[in-house]
Every structure is written in structure tokens, then in C-alpha cells.
Amino acid sequence: MIKKASLLTACSVTAFSAWAQDTSPDTLVVTANRFEQPRSTVLAPTTVVTRQDIDRWQSTSVNDVLRRLPGVDITQNGGSGQLSSIFIRGTNASHVLVLIDGVRLNLAGVSGSADLSQFPIALVQRVEYIRGPRSAVYGSDAIGGVVNIITTRDEPGTEISAGWGSNSYQNYDVSTQQQLGDKTRVTLLGDYAHTHGYDVVAYGNTGTQAQTDNDGFLSKTLYGALEHNFTDAWSGFVRGYGYDNRTNYDAYYSPGSPLLDTRKLYSQSWDAGLRYNGELIKSQLITSYSHSKDYNYDPHYGRYDSSATLDEMKQYTVQWANNVIVGHGSIGAGVDWQKQTTTPGTGYVEDGYDQRNTGIYLTGLQQVGDFTFEGAARSDDNSQFGRHGTWQTSAGWEFIEGYRFIASYGTSYKAPNLGQLYGFYGNPNLDPEKSKQWEGAFEGLTAGVNWRISGYRNDVSDLIDYDDHTLKYYNEGKARIKGVEATANFDTGPLTHTVSYDYVDARNAITDTPLLRRAKQQVKYQLDWQLYDFDWGITYQYLGTRYDKDYSSYPYQTVKMGGVSLWDLAVAYPVTSHLTVRGKIANLFDKDYETVYGYQTAGREYTLSGSYTF
């Protein structure tokens, strides 16, 4: 880890705090430029969520964590474990880069977008979330933003927890971190979660057969990590985790064919790294291997039957990153190498698939008087579509003490996914989708209120679409996204308030029609307080109107889905210094709504849990 004092001295800027549960402006983040830096020096809007926040919200899924954050719009085909999509600032679900400990999530390689309904919440110790383009640092996918899920635990100790809730939900978790001598620590975790679920209905998406069954979810997780400090400057780590999930869902049925309504996902990841943390120079070398097997099958025949489908991908990654303190800032440079291989049949591709990508990048951060400058440039060499370059730049001006104006511009891209390139309807000549983004923002501290308001525009070209006549994918689509985002956090006596507002106008630039499944407006409000040792929390979310497709008849019709206001209530009580009990009511007023047309949401749900630490 970087020594905090040296970087704070090099980047000594006025403290501005973005929307986050951890409101300290000097909170260190690693996602912006791959090395730790104070959040106040990151000019892009940044949110940090800690494990303490997740426990206070009593979230049982990663999607429940992310839905609370500015700019995020989550859609899901029902309840726990069902297919979900993340839209950030109106961009496509495939325009979000999801990292696990700084390494690209493997599952995103098969489908082209990350489905975090499958990722275990037990592994999440911290989330760093950056909005806006970041391809100049990370390469493909980082058009709407970057979500970095960090699994490293900060504090030693052991925790045993259990929870129960509606729809026969149950969860059991054991985790421990122990110091072995002065220089070595080990972390272990095991988690089991299961819910019977409910019938998501899937109106218009099941073919000729109604499927009036519960659509449940089961997840089993193991995690282990070993960290060692060789000297004050040199350290290394090895970690691995895996999860085994089963999801029941409502599938499309064709008469005379098996009903593939069960999903079985196996995923494992292994990382190893070596870090050098000097006073002026920082360097890290990280290697990673991940392997996922994703079955969809009819449980009457089993996942090895010829009717079943299998998406299998292996991902190999090597990252070498370096950072040098220069003046009142730093310069960074590095190389990424990634190889993805698939087995025949993955993504409906008959043959096996192998794709390599090598990226080199340069980043810079510097303070000059009242100005802060940030920039990055990157070149990717891909075995499929050749070389592609991206860049971004930002400038911040503290025009009055405690108030800052920020202007930024960046380019980014999304590489075509496996099915689009080599599937039955694939086109190997596809180009990457490209984005140009502008943003202007004011932020400051006024009468105890940390606030930020920004306006942005994102023009996306060469969008990949499907042609009903040629039965092929092609580059032609264009999107124009305009938006306003406002965030604030403040205290009034014992009450802590966190609020955000998003207005997103995301349209097809050719037809001027709204992009599907994006809420035009969102309001999010979190209120926390303590009363007689009880920790209370109220969460409010307003989801505005959105459009979707009704697939129950042909030709498909566009439908308008009305807005909804949702409330959650959570409370926790420390029975002793070691034992805490928690309870939560989600969707307090039992609102009936959908985020994907035809797929029901859960309605009111209750959970009760307890944790014992020692």
C-alpha cells in the first residue's frame, strides 16, 4: 500500500468530498488511476461504499448496494439471482466495467455485460464506483463508469452471522482474519445463501407454457487469502475464491423441446501479486486466472444432456503498474495483458474462441496553484479488431476556497462480445463501439452541506445492432445521452442525510426515441440516526418512467412503465459489544412495480439477522 502521508503531501489540495457513505475527503481510493490517492484529488465523481455501509443497509445482494448510488439504474428479471443489468448514466449495460480487486470480471466476457446478481455479497468488503469514461486507464467497457469490488478485509478478527427472511430466505456466514507473526496474515470465508423465491411470471416471455413455480436461488461461496510483508517496502499476496450458484427462472418454451429453466454457475478466481511501496516510486505486478462454467438446462434431463447449453470461459490476466511522485502530483504507466479462451458452444459459437489484448497506458495528476489537472492515454492491441486508442483529460479550479469547478472530456470504447463476433448471427468484421463525453461540474461545502452538481453529454457511435433482413450484427447505431446529476450529504443534529438526483435523457440519435429500460428521473435518499443504542436507517428511492418492449405479441410493442416510490426501513441493536441483531423491511409499502416488463418484483420482504464478532 502507498504511504498515506507522502501522497497527501504531494497532492495537497482542498478537501472536496463526493457523494459517499464514507464522507472523509482524505479517504484513499485505488480505482481512479490504479494506485491509492485521496478521493479529493480525483476529479471524476467517485463513490465509496464500505462493509459497514453494507451491514447497516442489510443488503443481501450486490444489486441492492449499487441501486442506492448516483447514476445507477438496476433492472432485473425478478428476484434474487435472476438476470440483471446495470445502466450507468443512461449507457448500455455492456458499457459498465466491473472489476474484482482491480481485475476484469470474467463473466462479462461471455455475455458482453456484467450480471452481478450472481456475485456473492459476502465477498464484498468495499465498492469504489467512478462515473464517466475510464477506457484511457482500463480499456474496453469503461464508457458509463467503473465498479471496483474489493474483497480485501481491513480489520482482523472473526465473525459468525446468520439471517432469515421472506420467501424462505436463509444465510449463514463465517469469516476470519488472523495475524501469523508480525508480517503475515490469513483471511478465510465461507458463505451459504438460499431462497425459495417466488414466481416472477415472465409475462410474454415464456412461449406457450405458463410456469407457475417458485424461481429460487442458491449460492455457496469459499474465499481464502494470504498476505505477507517481506520488508517495509516489499509485500506480496495470494488469494482465491469460488462460488457455486443455482438459479430457477421462467424460460421460453417451445412445444416438443426441453424447458431450459435452471441455471448452474461455477466460478473460480486466483490472484497473486508483488508490490513495491517506496517513498516516491510504487510498482505492482499482478497475475490472475479465472474460470467460469455457466449451464442452462432442463432439470428433468440434467446439465450434461445434449439439450443443455454451456458457456465456459477461462481468463488469464497480467498487470504491471507503476507510479512516480512528481512535484505536487504523480505520473503512472503500465501494461495490461489479457487472454480469454472459450470451449465450443459458448455464446452459441460452434468453435472454440481465443482472444488476446495488450494495453499500454499513461496517467498523470498535478496541482498548480488553485488548479488540479488529470489526464490519461491508452493504446490497446486486440487480436480481433487491431489497435484502438483512447484518452481523457480533466481540470479543476478552486475559484473560491471550498468551491471548485471541474471540466472534463474523454473518449472510451466497447469491444464487440463473443456472440456478436462469432455466434450464429455473428459478424467478425465488427468494429468497437465508440464514445465521446463532456462533463462540467461545480462542487463545494456550504453551511455544512457537501454538494456537487454536474451536467454531461455522451455521444456513442458504431453501436452494434441486429439486422432482421441480413440476420447479422452490424455497426450503425448511435446514441445521444444528456444528463444532470446532483448529490449532497449533511448532518442535522443526530440525523445524517445523503441525497442524489439524476435526470437522464438517453435517446437513439437516429430515430430520436428513448433507449429502453432507463428511468428518466431518479431520486435517492438515505437517512441514518441513532436512538437509545438503536441504529436506524430509512432508504427512499423514486424510479421515474421508462420504456420497454412487450414480447407477448408480434410485432413487439413499446410500452411505457410508470414511476414508483420505494421505502426501506432497517434497524440494528448491539446486544453486547460482540453480538448485534438486525432487522429490515424492504419495500415497506408493498408497491407493485416492474423494472423489466412482464417480470414481477418481490413486494414487501422481511429479514432478521444476527452477527457475533470476536
Swiss-Prot record:
Regulation: Calcium increases vitamin B12 binding affinity by a factor of 50-100.
Segments forming domain TBDR plug: 38-152
Periplasmic side: 21-157, 179-183, 228-231, 278, 326-327, 370, 401-402, 444-448, 491-493, 530-534, 573-584
TBDR beta-barrel domain segment(s): 155-614
Residues that hold Ca(2+) 2 according to the record: D213, D215, Y249, D250, D261
GO biological-process terms attached to the record: cobalamin transport; monoatomic ion transmembrane transport
Effect of disrupting the coding gene: No longer takes up colicins E1 and E3; colicin K uptake does not change.
Position of the signal peptide: 1-20
Compartments, record wording: Cell outer membrane
CDD domains associated with the record: ligand_gated_channel
Family annotation (Pfam families): Plug, TonB_dep_Rec_b-barrel
Short motif (TonB C-terminal box): ranges: 597-614
Assembly: Interacts with TonB. (Microbial infection) The hairpin motif of the receptor-binding domain of colicin E3 (ColE3) interacts with BtuB without displacing BtuB's central plug. An N-terminal fragment of E3 binds OmpF; trimeric complexes with ColE3, BtuB and OmpF can be cross-linked and immunoprecipitated.
Protein name: Vitamin B12 transporter BtuB
Organism for this UniProt entry: Escherichia coli (strain K12)
Gene that specifies this protein: btuB
